[in-house]
């Protein structure tokens, strides 16, 4: 897997304009939709249990995000996820805040038990709690802690039979056999709500067009990180508001050439 190979997936997303069905949280809906549009994908936010199965069946990818968790939303996620599985639509799961409360942790473990996942994406604490490994968490954004991130990612990939993506200062992608570390991004991303949630949906757009889910995830993370770096270079001194606007611009303007030039990945 080389940078040229990875960068081509960016062009493929823009050429294909994949439909990404998001059942996401109320905090990030607008930002997620705008980010996907900027990238070149087609977002749809359909939540009603009466329509999610049908919508998921025609999507390029389905993204399930439990940031603002409600019982009716969980029901919709299960209906959509099972429909996606029946129709060979890849499902991505973002277990936001797994470990923060008993209910949230229960749901985070129930969804992978019921739905076949292409990708699970979270911080180290969230992924550890999904697979019942000890890792402290405070609130839905906690990611720091004591533990081996690569080991947790590999364990999650093996136990859940999926590609595990753990994001943080460095990002890890693994299917249990192939493991890649991505070292792009910028710390100002943590000052904008929803950047992690948008990232999962961006990975969804890449997974919709690239069936090697490890390659798709690595391409998405590299693209996202480079876009953040380019946006930060123009706006970081102004603050997070200016960065957010420029980040959307860079999601639209970052090219495959930029990925080849600035991408930083390591196969381990």
Swiss-Prot record:
UniProt cofactor(s): Mg(2+)
Keywords attached to this entry: ATP-binding, Kinase, Magnesium, Metal-binding, Nucleotide-binding, Thiamine biosynthesis, Transferase
Pfam entry (one): HK
Molecular function in Gene Ontology: ATP binding; hydroxyethylthiazole kinase activity; magnesium ion binding
A biological process term (GO) from this entry: thiamine biosynthetic process
Reaction(s) the record says it catalyses: 5-(2-hydroxyethyl)-4-methylthiazole + ATP = 4-methyl-5-(2-phosphooxyethyl)-thiazole + ADP + H(+)
Binding-site residues for ATP, renumbered to this chain: 121, 167
EC number: 2.7.1.50
SUPFAM superfamilies per record: Ribokinase-like
Residues that coordinate or bind substrate: 45, 194
Pathway entry: Cofactor biosynthesis; thiamine diphosphate biosynthesis; 4-methyl-5-(2-phosphoethyl)-thiazole from 5-(2-hydroxyethyl)-4-methylthiazole: step 1/1
NCBIfam families per the UniProt record, alphabetical: PRK09355.1, thiM
Function (record text): Catalyzes the phosphorylation of the hydroxyl group of 4-methyl-5-beta-hydroxyethylthiazole (THZ).
Record family assignment: Belongs to the Thz kinase family.
Identification of the protein by name: Hydroxyethylthiazole kinase
């Amino acid at each position: 897997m080389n940078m040229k190979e990875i960068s081509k997936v960016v062009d493929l997303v823009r050429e294909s304009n994949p439909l990404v069905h998001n059942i996401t949280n109320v905090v990030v809906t607008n930002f997620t939709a705008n980010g996907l549009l900027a990238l070149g994908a087609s977002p749809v936010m359909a939540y009603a249990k009466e329509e999610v199965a049908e919508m998921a069946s025609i999507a390029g990818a389905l993204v399930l995000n439990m940031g603002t968790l409600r019982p009716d939303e969980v029901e919709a996620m299960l209906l959509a996820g099972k429909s996606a599985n029946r129709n060979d639509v890849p499902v991505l799961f973002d277990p936001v805040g797994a470990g923060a409360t008993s209910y949230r942790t229960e749901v985070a473990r129930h969804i992978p038990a019921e739905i076949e996942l292409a990708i699970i994406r979270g911080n180290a604490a969230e992924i550890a709690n999904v697979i019942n490994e000890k890792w402290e968490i405070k609130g839905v954004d906690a990611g720091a802690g004591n533990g081996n991130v690569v080991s947790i990612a590999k364990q999650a990939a093996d136990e859940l039979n999926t590609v595990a993506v753990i994001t943080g200062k460095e990002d890890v992608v693994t299917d249990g056999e192939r493991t890649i570390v991505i070292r792009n991004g910028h710390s100002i991303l943590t000052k904008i709500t929803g950047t992690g949630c948008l990232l999962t949906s961006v990975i969804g757009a890449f997974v919709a067009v690239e069936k090697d889910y490890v390659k798709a995830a690595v391409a998405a993370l590299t693209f996202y990180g480079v876009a953040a770096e380019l946006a930060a270079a123009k706006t970081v001194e102004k603050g997070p508001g200016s960065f957010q606007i420029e980040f959307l611009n860079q999601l639209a303007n970052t090219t495959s050439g930029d990925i080849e030039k600035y991408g930083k990945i390591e196969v381990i």
